[in-house]
Amino acid sequence: MGMFIQKEHKPTMAEEEHVDFEGGEAGASLTFPMQCSALRKNGHVVIKGRPCKIVDMSTSKTGKHGHAKVHIVALDIFNGRKYEDMSPSTHNMDVPVVKRDEYQLVNIDDGYLNLMTTDGTTKDDVRLPEGELGNEIEEGFEEGKDLIITVVSAMGEEIALACRDAPSA
């Protein structure tokens, strides 16, 4: 009896599977790093694990051998809470990947918005916002208006941020 040793096949560059990183959301990172000195007012940043919009920034020079420090004041994009952070300008901070999408309101069901994209895909996991915006959406829906809802998503959270009348065809 002969013994066979099977050699492991290693794919060549041409045989390797092409992976498309541009497509869908699966595996897409929720944040990306950016140097503090590159952050800008009205941009986004993660502070204490929350996605925030920068409302104020200032840079302070420190002593002879220190680094310039960046002071950031930002508001949580989902609950409006104020956060502050101080970091050396050369340090990296996480920036959330923030996506804005518009949907047509189809229905309001048990505190959730039933939404539809322009290609007919439905989405029903966005909560009816509380307060003034929620009232505006409910009243407009009850009046039979065609409403377009702006939904912002970042770091696995979503919120309805605005509503407007759909353009009449």
UniProtKB/Swiss-Prot annotation:
SUPFAM superfamilies: Nucleic acid-binding proteins, Translation proteins SH3-like domain
Signal peptide range: none
Gene Ontology terms, MF aspect: ribosome binding; RNA binding; translation elongation factor activity; translation termination factor activity
Pfam family, one: IF5A-like_N
GO biological process: cytoplasmic translational elongation; cytoplasmic translational termination; positive regulation of translational elongation; positive regulation of translational termination; translational elongation
Domain of life: Eukaryota
Keywords: Cytoplasm, Elongation factor, Hypusine, Nucleus, Protein biosynthesis, RNA-binding
Gene Ontology CC: cytosol; nucleus; protein-containing complex
Task of the protein: Translation factor that promotes translation elongation and termination, particularly upon ribosome stalling at specific amino acid sequence contexts. Binds between the exit (E) and peptidyl (P) site of the ribosome and promotes rescue of stalled ribosome: specifically required for efficient translation of polyproline-containing peptides as well as other motifs that stall the ribosome. Acts as a ribosome quality control (RQC) cofactor by joining the RQC complex to facilitate peptidyl transfer during CAT tailing step.
NCBIfam families: eIF_5A
Descriptive protein name: Eukaryotic translation initiation factor 5A-2
Protein source organism: Schizosaccharomyces pombe (strain 972 / ATCC 24843) (Fission yeast)
Lineage: Eukaryota, Fungi, Dikarya, Ascomycota, Taphrinomycotina
Gene: tif51b
